[in-house]
Curated annotation (Swiss-Prot):
One BP term from GO: double-strand break repair via homologous recombination
Gene3D superfamilies tied to this protein: 3.90.320.10, P-loop containing nucleotide triphosphate hydrolases (3.40.50.300)
Positions of [4Fe-4S] cluster binding: C803, C1121, C1124, C1130
CC cofactor: Mg(2+); [4Fe-4S] cluster
SUPFAM superfamilies reported for this sequence: P-loop containing nucleoside triphosphate hydrolases, Restriction endonuclease-like
Protein name: ATP-dependent helicase/deoxyribonuclease subunit B
The protein's enzyme class: hydrolase
Ranges for domain UvrD-like helicase C-terminal: 282-597
EC numbers on record: 3.1.-.-
Binding note for cofactor: Binds 1 [4Fe-4S] cluster.
Gene name as annotated: addB
Source species: Symbiobacterium thermophilum (strain DSM 24528 / JCM 14929 / IAM 14863 / T)
Amino acid sequence: MRFIIGGAGSGKSQRCLDELTQAAQAAPAGPPLILLVPEQATFQVEQALLGSGRLKGIIRAQVLSFQRLAWRVSLKAGGLALPPLSDLGKQMVLRALLEKKRDDLRLFHQVADKPGFIERVAGSIRELRSYRQGPESLRRQLSQLEAEGLGETSLGAKLHDLALVMDELRSYIEGRFTDPDEYLTVLAARLEESRLLEGAEVWVDGFNGFTPQELAVLGAVMRSARQVHISLCIPPGQLYKAGGHHSPSDLFHPVLSTYDQLMQLAAESGVAVDPPLYLNEPLRFRGAPELAHVERYLFRQSAPAWPGAPERIALVEAQNRREEVAAAAREILRLVREEGLRFREIAVVARDLEGYGDLAATLFAEHGIPAFIDRRRTVAHHPLVELLRAALEVVVQDWAYGPVFRYLKTDLTGVSRAEIDLLENYVIEHGIRGRAWQQQEPWQYLRRYTLEEDAVPAGPAQQALLDEIHRIRRRATAPLLAFQRRLQRRGRPGPTVREITTYLFQLLDDLKVARQLEAWKAEAEQRGDLETAREHEQVWTRVLELFDQIVEGLGDQVLSPKVYLQVLSAGLDGLKLGLIPPGLDQVIVGTVERSRHAGVRATLILGATEKDFPPQPAEDAIFTDRERERLKQSGLDVGPTSLERLFQEQFLTYVALTRGSDFLWISYPLADESGRAAAPSPVVGRMRRLFPELKPRPAAPPAPDAEAAVAQVATPRQLAAAVARALRRARSGYAVEPHWLDLYQCIVLDPDLHREGAAVLAAVGYEEWLRRRGTPVGRELARLLYGDRLVTSVSRLEAFLSCPFRHFAGYALRLQGRAEFTVSAPEFGLFYHAALSLFVRELERDGLAWDTLTPDEAWRRMDSIIDRLAPRLQSEILLSSPQHRYLLRVIRRTLQSSLDYLSEHVLHGEFRPVAVEVPFGEEMDGLPPVEVDLPGGGRVLLRGRIDRVDALEGRDGRWYVRVIDYKSGRRDLRLGDFYHGLTLQLLLYLMAVVEGGEPLLPGTRVPAGALYLPVYDPVEPVNAPVPPDEVRPLRRKRYQARGLVSDDPAVIQAMDAAGLGLIQAKLKKDGTVYKGAPVASPDQFRQLFAHLRRVVRACGEQILQGEAAIAPYRLGPHTACQYCAYRPVCQFDPAVEPQGYRRLEKMDAPDVWQRVAAAGGEGDV
């Protein structure tokens, strides 16, 4: 045996390749020449071996990993008698075994169902096997603990459970499979007798350490081969520490320990050790002395400072990871364009690849950089994996909403996304779940917008919708229903694993999944996305292999679909794809230990923070560090502790910093992904001590001027992004420099630039912003939408005056939010209105007066009404679940409490309800519409429905009219809001009855009031217990009717004869009204009505002219955007466009009275 000793960059790997190549050239036929490397490096080393051009092919020379060598030995011995049990198969078997032995487990049964636990158990068993530990050694350690009285500790429970599981696993595997975890053990035992390496020369390269299993194999290799060369990354000057003279904190401690182990192994194997070959010169850094300085001195206690600023090393700090990766992309393009590097000569290293991998894939693609993310990618969210999981969950969870639509949205079911959206909206609206999916009859659920009549048949449009829903449902569920029927066939104990797996494959076959994946693969190849193409291909192959493993491992066992789902999920969770780099010239993004970068000239290290570089290894999920140390002291080595792994990470940091030959670029974010401050790695401090003039530079230039912005531009898409940022400032009211507008015109006019930048500019919405700020929809389009006669409602006018675009989106485009099967504020309001209206109508029908009813009689009537209305609300939603039945109790309690206080208005007042749910408007069976003529000849016709009209006939024969609007909460009529058109409804209803109420109240009608009546069950906060006789007055304040009433004391007296505070207006002892009360004289009512007409006229004119601007109001702290459903459509951003608000003047009642009095009955708003 001979060691090849040298530090990073000294040419160890190249020396191994050169010696192997020379031997192969000298004697093309002869004993094997084997280069033994880590599994993940085999592809890149083979490329390097053949890429030199000195070998035209491989005959003697072989690049092998330990696993591949084991396979060669078994092949020479006649092959594997039994199929191997893959890692995924083992996880699924473990899942079933844990379920089977659940009652015998001491600890694992508590966490067996947690995601990832099975994978951790499988990993622990693999680690134990690699350290040549079995259930016997675990039980010996458990017996030792029990002798010390510690058998019931957590460590004892873990040893017991692991030994039990390993025993069960071995019993299960025996005679059925071979265990890949035992391959190296078998290899060590059989290698010598196989004579595979007889006369062979072996080079071992790329390892920093070996497991006990691998050391046993190396011992057999030493005894079998003619010559073994082992390269180790140890600077020759550090080798004096070998033989146990190094501490765990020493940088090269992991490799020196490996050297010691190999020397001991050679001695035990009777193998002579030749003098080492020392490689003293850092050949890699011949053209970059700064990097040689890093390799030699970075981790030394004392080191000379580098004179001057290094030209080939950069430190970069970024605000966040995204900015950091974007800066790395720009640096890669600079290296390629200015330094002449190829993409394949650039390595990007991240210790936290999970945090950087997706960002690198996205941003590098945006910059046009070909890149391969070197990681085993999980496919847990691939549509095929999701389909399998969801299909089983549908059966197990009895067609719950989530699994059904996860199944449908995989795009593998033959149903289009538009059809799925239609079906999903219908299902959500009507709360469909469970057996309703399995019924043969078409669904007939329809939403009702009134509760006061029995169900009516579906109209033509509704029936067409129901027919379409039925067609989609039948097509979407037919294969899944067939799968369920196969699973649930009666007359047998239950399906076996083999049968369930067969049924799943039949489902995939029914859906033609293989054909769809092939089509996706072809599409990906056509657009040049080779990684995705291979992913679609591999995931199908791996799923079929998974099915084979399930059947081979558990085939004839009877499992319930629920347990089978758990077993399959364990396999799917561990399903990862290792993709070979699809291109020859591309940047490799990976971790230090996984990616082998040959011929790297530039290394970019991302995420050099205190937390991640080197990372702080977490404790193992099974054995804690303290438990590992205790076991090691007792003679049971189960692997390194987190502290030992931290020392290994320090060595890997050294490897990462010395990987590139020409350039080193280190970056770190100042904040993590959660926004918390992140400190730079200690490595950054060491670099600055080595290079005092090395200063961190910002990833993005801080100045917002054009030169700094353009300095960040590397691609047409980035140019568009820079222009978009500048134009977005225009939306905030700032001036835009002329050169940005010039660049904008370049992007719009240049076909290539526009193709790349159109999406970015569309996202910022600059063109749309210009359009909506400058021009309305237009009179012609408005005429098509509305006609010359604008028939509308007051709520629509309020929406327009709140924000014109809100009106346009809701009433012109008719955009609606998704209707859901839930009881929210609108449904509560609908129920309350219906119940109170029906209460009054039935009193009238039965010839009863409200004030003659006792509270109990009134409540019995209301209780009966609630029972009749409850099934009518949204397909019996109030009876559909315990949660909704509780809401019905809330409704019942609210109406009981509200009815009690509403009755006081009848008992202590003279106004009586004359009609409820009073319609007004064209083609409505009620009062005529409120009509307002427009200057251009058009007309606005207002319609609506008034909750309740009360009246009192005066001695003069005139009708005093009061309108009531029920509200599910306390509401005030603020005259300032009315003046601006934000709350027109209540006073417009009063005007509709006063001016057009002849069919209801013949004669002269006088406005007496417009009031909001609360229907709710408030809680009154108090500071101390309240006597029973004071409770009612306190609650009565909460039920007070609020609004505007006549200033006539007689009218106020008629509304609250007992002075109980039923309304806001109160009379003094002398019969006059208190100052500041919300009252109006007849003239003031006329002035309000005149103002109302002016608002309607102005509003109607703008609507018919096509006004649809995004111009939300702001009035004090309130804005139109607070509860607007259309914000995702308009994209109005208050933080970016504060100047975009239409600011309204805050006005109190005196201000309003002054304005409307000055305007009189004429003029504009």
